[in-house]
């Protein structure tokens, strides 16, 4: 996120019975011409010659038609919106919440997203995005040792550079937020079980659960294994969902090996297609 390879994070889900999912995966493997028993990922189905397979999978005769959902995250906007929510919203921010929904900070994030690169140049702006993403990361030993110092040094330098008025206003506001950044980072260092602020998976899963919650009050999720999905974070999400929607319940998030779970493989296909289209 931020300095990553893909500007879009896609999180897909399908609502389908296990047996039907297995049959569909086997059908797709036959159409692809898969050999052996290895798992086939979305790049295999995205090759140009397999376009008819993709069109069928997304079409009205497919078993997942009307039973698939994709949550797309623009990773650059995610970083900017989360950064400003934490530093300028005036209240505590939970890692499971989708950034960019705060009416106070959203216009600021949009201003940076739309105009800052033109003001500061691509290389400098990419560096700022990377520093922003690293500001609240605490679980990667390859990160710089002084992320707060490096971020605010960049902010100070940008404050001395001419930029669009709305961009300059946001950068000016950031100059006084260092105590908030230090306190937030310290809190996450002291409690590694807190949901990471710059991890898009948790908000995407949260929104996925809310989407399917419109169809059923009690949800059970089967998800591929991810280190970010700890029992504590899943419990935090379940509590938040129950509090925000009376009667709605996230009963289970079961982590599985995607090689042995056709429903997860189908979701991977759908996510890959959506990411390519985005």
Where are these regions (language model features)?
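Phosphate-ester processing/binding pockets and catalytic centers
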Residues: 2-278
């Amino acid at each position: 996120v931020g300095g990553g390879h893909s500007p879009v994070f896609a999180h897909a889900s399908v609502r389908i019975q296990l047996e039907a999912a297995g049959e569909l995966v086997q059908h797709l493997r036959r159409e692809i011409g898969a050999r052996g028993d290895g798992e086939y990922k979305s790049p295999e189905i995205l090759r140009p010659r397999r376009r008819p397979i993709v069109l069928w999978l997304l079409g009205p005769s497919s078993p997942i038609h009307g039973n698939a959902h994709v949550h797309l995250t623009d990773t650059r906007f995610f970083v900017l919106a989360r950064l400003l929510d934490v530093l300028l919203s005036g209240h505590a921010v939970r890692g499971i919440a989708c950034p960019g929904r705060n009416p106070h900070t959203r216009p600021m994030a949009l201003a940076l997203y739309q105009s800052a690169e033109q003001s500061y140049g691509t290389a400098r702006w990419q560096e700022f995005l990377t520093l922003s993403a690293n500001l609240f990361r605490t679980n990667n030993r390859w990160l710089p040792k002084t992320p707060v110092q490096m971020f605010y040094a960049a902010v100070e330098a940008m404050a001395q550079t001419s930029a669009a008025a709305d961009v300059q206003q946001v950068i000016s506001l950031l100059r006084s937020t260092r105590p908030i950044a230090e306190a937030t980072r310290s809190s996450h260092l002291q409690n590694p079980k807190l949901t990471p602020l710059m991890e898009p998976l948790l908000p995407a899963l949260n929104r996925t659960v809310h989407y399917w919650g419109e169809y059923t009050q009690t949800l059970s999720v089967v998800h591929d294994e991810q280190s970010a999905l700890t029992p504590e974070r899943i419990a935090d999400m379940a509590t938040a969902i129950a509090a925000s929607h009376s009667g709605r319940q996230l009963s289970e998030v079961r982590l599985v090996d995607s090689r042995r779970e056709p429903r997860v493989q189908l979701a991977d296909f759908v996510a890959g297609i959506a990411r390519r289209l985005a």
